[in-house]
């Protein structure tokens, strides 16, 4: 959630006509990388509009993969790996987005729907991967709250349907099992857990059955996807993480290893942790290069597989909350360049 003048609030000193600027909080030093690709600005200008990306990988032709990004005021965009817009689906009020392959060679896209601020809803669409177009596929009402975070996972072996986790504004974490019958999607929801304050970032690791949730002003929670047992694994410390904690993403390696990445929005950085122990590895920023730098990031996405010659060892996408003088957009970064900058073991 972008906060105006984050880190630059003016504080009255109680002296007539006098005030002082509070310096922004800056975390530990961060290495820098640059974006290889950017999308066009979203259609909503001069507002906090672009929010969250998702990646669909074309296994047969990785360079022909697609990404989906939200404009909270307008709807869903589909882009290719050159950043070109493939399509747009009007659907105002959407926030976070995720996608997953489902039977029949189809791709289900789900976004948290904030058009009703009293009820968490899941907006569903099917992605035609040949044309890059989205077709609406209904809504599922989840429960009370204002929808923010959303992430999906396929159930463990033998399970049916798709599991969607919702992280609304109030801190309740919902678990919805989505099934399809006769072309209609329905959901059965239970409450998985509760954290004290506002959440948003959401990523599920099916290897360990762990759901990672970002509590914006507290840190990152690891939650058992079945029992709801939780523990705070990375607290905001103004070193590795500076509030708000926003988007979360993982790059899995092996049985339970890899990396967890979090948007440290308060100082325009990204914190990287080693899995499975969520041990801090380092921080990076996206600096000015062929494209502009990236600030005030909400959503991120990461896939460490091959995406063709432009992104041969993985793709990291960040929402750019500034992108001046244009409207907000999304920027693509080579994941191997992030790891090289961090001098991460490979």
Where are these regions (language model features)?
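Sequence/structural signature of beta-propeller domains
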Residues: 20-346
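Short linear sequence elements within intrinsically disordered, low-complexity coil regions
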Residues: 10-13, 335
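C-terminal motif of bacterial Sec signal peptides marking the signal peptidase cleavage site
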Residues: 15-18
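Bacterial N-terminal signal peptides that target proteins for export
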Residues: 1-9
């Amino acid at each position: 959630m972008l906060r105006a003048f984050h880190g630059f609030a003016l504080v009255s000193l109680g002296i007539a006509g006098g005030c002082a600027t509070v310096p922004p909080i800056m975390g530990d030093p961060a290495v820098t990388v640059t974006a290889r690709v950017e999308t066009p600005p979203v259609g909503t200008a001069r507002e906090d509009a672009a929010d969250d990306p998702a990646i669909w990988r074309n296994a047969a032709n990785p360079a022909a993969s697609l990404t989906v990004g939200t404009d909270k005021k307008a709807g869903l965009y589909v882009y290719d790996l050159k950043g070109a817009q493939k399509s747009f689906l009007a659907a105002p009020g959407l926030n976070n987005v995720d996608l997953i392959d489902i039977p029949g060679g189809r791709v289900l896209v789900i976004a948290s729907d904030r058009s009703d601020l009293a009820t968490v809803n899941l907006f569903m669409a099917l992605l035609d991967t040949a044309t890059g177009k989205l077709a609406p596929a209904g809504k599922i009402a989840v429960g009370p709250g204002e929808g923010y975070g959303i992430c999906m996972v396929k159930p463990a072996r033998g399970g049916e349907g798709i599991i969607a986790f919702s992280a609304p504004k109030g801190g309740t974490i919902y678990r919805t099992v989505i099934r399809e019958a006769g072309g209609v999607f329905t959901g059965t929801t239970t409450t998985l857990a509760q954290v004290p304050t506002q959440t948003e970032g959401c990523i599920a690791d099916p290897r360990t059955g762990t759901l990672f949730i970002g509590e914006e002003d507290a840190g990152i929670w690891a939650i058992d996807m079945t029992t709801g047992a939780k523990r705070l694994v990375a607290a905001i410390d103004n070193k590795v993480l500076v509030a708000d904690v926003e988007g979360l993403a993982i790059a899995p390696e092996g049985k339970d290893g890899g990396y967890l990445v979090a948007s440290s929005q308060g100082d325009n950085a990204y914190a990287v942790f080693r899995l499975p122990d969520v041990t801090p590895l380092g921080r990076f920023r996206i600096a000015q290069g062929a494209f502009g730098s990236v600030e005030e990031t909400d959503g991120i996405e990461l896939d460490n597989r091959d995406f063709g010659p432009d992104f041969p060892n993985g793709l990291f996408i960040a929402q750019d909350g500034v992108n001046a003088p244009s409207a907000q957009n999304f920027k693509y970064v080579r994941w191997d360049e992030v790891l090289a900058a961090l001098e991460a073991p490979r």
